[in-house]
Design a protein with these regions (language model features):
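Single conserved hydrophobic/aromatic residue that forms the stacking wall/gate
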Residues: 1-11
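Structural preference for solvent-exposed beta-strand-turn elements
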Residues: 12-168
Length: 168
């Protein structure tokens, strides 16, 4: 009961976002979403809302990606998780330029757009593994062109079907 109450309070009210905004963000995160389902939470995307933005985070415990999108009609912030692929498929099927309304109702993320109403089950956001980043003193900046060139020059050494992901 306590766990359910915590989830209900995570996103108290609601927010709106354009279809194109959330589809773009979801497409970027899907590449990292766990496909093998070793832990159910890894097939979910972490949804964090503040006064003007929606942050989506996905991880497979080796990599993590976060995207930020602009929202409208914000009422209050919070966070929850929802199945990434189902959310992406649902949003992609909505009409172009549709404004999508998201709100939490108990353990369900409710999604409304036009006359369509949809429900997705959620998992507690506290269960979602998030990487802790250290101070970025060793950070470097590199242009996308230079990074692409470096990867192309070393890609010959990658294994094609090696199950040891750290070697690829």
């Amino acid at each position: 009961a306590k766990d359910r109450r915590q989830r209900q309070m995570c996103i108290r009210d609601s927010f709106y976002i354009l279809k194109e905004e959330i589809v773009k963000s979801l497409n970027l995160t899907l590449g990292v979403v766990e496909k093998r389902q070793t832990l159910p939470i890894l097939s979910n995307v972490l949804i964090e809302v503040d006064e003007s933005s929606l942050k989506l985070t996905a991880t497979d415990l080796e990599s993590e990606i976060s995207t930020t999108s602009t929202i409208s009609n914000f009422n209050s912030g919070g966070k929850t998780t929802a199945p990434a692929r189902k959310l992406s498929d649902l949003c992609r099927l909505l009409p172009d330029m549709a404004e999508i309304h998201f709100f939490l109702d108990g353990d369900n993320l409710k999604i409304e757009s036009g006359s369509g109403k949809y429900n997705l089950s959620t998992l507690p956001s506290d269960d979602f593994p998030v990487f802790e980043f250290e101070d970025s003193q060793g950070q470097i900046n590199i242009s996308s062109e230079n990074l692409k060139t470096i990867i192309m020059k070393t890609s010959f050494a990658m294994g094609n079907q090696d199950w040891r992901h750290y070697l690829n």
